[in-house]
Amino acid sequence: MYRNQLARASLRSTSSINQIRNMITAQAVVYAQHGEPKDVLKTLKYEIDDDNLDSNSIIVKTLGSPVNPSDINQIQGVYPSKPEKTTELGSNEPVAVCGNEGLFEILKVGDNVSNFKVGDWCVPTSVNMGTWRTHMLCGGDEMTKIPNPEQSKANGKPSGLSVNQGATISVNPLTAYLMLTHYVKLTPGKDWFIQNGGNSAVGKYATQISNLLGINSISVIRDRPDLQDLIKNMTEECGATKVITEEQNASKEFGSEIKSWVKETGGEIKLALNCVGGKNSTGIARKLNNNGLMLTYGGMSMQPVILPTSLHIFKNITSSGFWVTQLLKNDVELKRKTLGQIIEWYENRQLKDAPSKETKFNPSDELSRYYIDGIVNSKGGKQLIVY
């Protein structure tokens, strides 16, 4: 509602720009109907009135915004959380701006905004802000400040955040950290967690974060020709305690080997993180000790989670879903606290970000083309549009 009020006061469609003295020309990637991205995404050009800024609002420019699977699912209409469709940007029909994650720089602040100054970096406080755009007009409370490189340096930190780190901080790193810390108390040096999808972005963040917290990890990965090189990378670069294959995860005989690892530390496997489903999820659930918890945050195999009845009855295993959007939706303070921890690790060079394929936007081009291409190329890795 607040953004709609701001829009009426400070946004103009390109047809009325002759009446305005000082305007910021912007582009956004929008859709009016759900469908396949190549069929429904369009570029909407609009203007932001830089001279008549509401006292409680800010104007930001985008530094980078990624393409996430959830963004694609929103466009297709199959994601539970959907942005509101409006005409606030001057479109002829209600449209939604794509994108949920991104990094922004403050261009201008209203007179009543005290938590930002020009040049600050920020990320959206809530979901469905619509980050696939060049500029945004929003309320000062709709963004959360994160340090820019100059501020990190001034605070004596070894490193400042990169655009990739800032633009991708709100989903994968937060997902990994919250799954490890929000539900089960894991004793450093003793306890373990096990995860499938160990080579995924969230998997690598979870491995690194568990290492920083002193928690032992078991990562399950697919067998491949360069298996030993990958295992070496995950143990030496990410800090994985143990890395096993899907075949070993499914093997009852190999289970005794895992029990010996856990016995050496005097702890338990209390947590399993599942992003695959199917028999793979059964395998990691079987490794849990009594009263263990399995969190499911994805389903890459498109197969249902399968848990034998015996695990529920005799081991009291709990299986729950994890959705970072829902968890943080009504808990802004938890998001800020979690962001602060991830930022600290980035600044101290203790946490490595998942790499993205960066594509530089040319303002003379149609913005939607970059994201349509990014969606196509996302099968080969994370895509980040930088500005």
From Swiss-Prot:
Its EC number is 1.3.1.104. NADP(+) binds at residues 172, 199-202, 222-224, 297-300, 322-324, 382. It comes from the Eukaryota. Its main location: mitochondrion. Residues 1-23 form a transit peptide. It is an enzyme of class 1 (oxidoreductase). GO terms for cellular component: mitochondrial matrix. Keywords: Fatty acid biosynthesis, Fatty acid metabolism, Lipid biosynthesis, Lipid metabolism, Mitochondrion, NADP, Oxidoreductase, Transit peptide. GO terms for biological process: fatty acid biosynthetic process. The active site is at 79 (proton donor). It is found in: Mitochondrion matrix. SUPFAM superfamilies: GroES-like, NAD(P)-binding Rossmann-fold domains. The keyword Transit peptide applies. Homodimer. This is Enoyl-[acyl-carrier-protein] reductase 2, mitochondrial. The lineage of its organism: Eukaryota, Fungi, Dikarya, Ascomycota, Saccharomycotina.
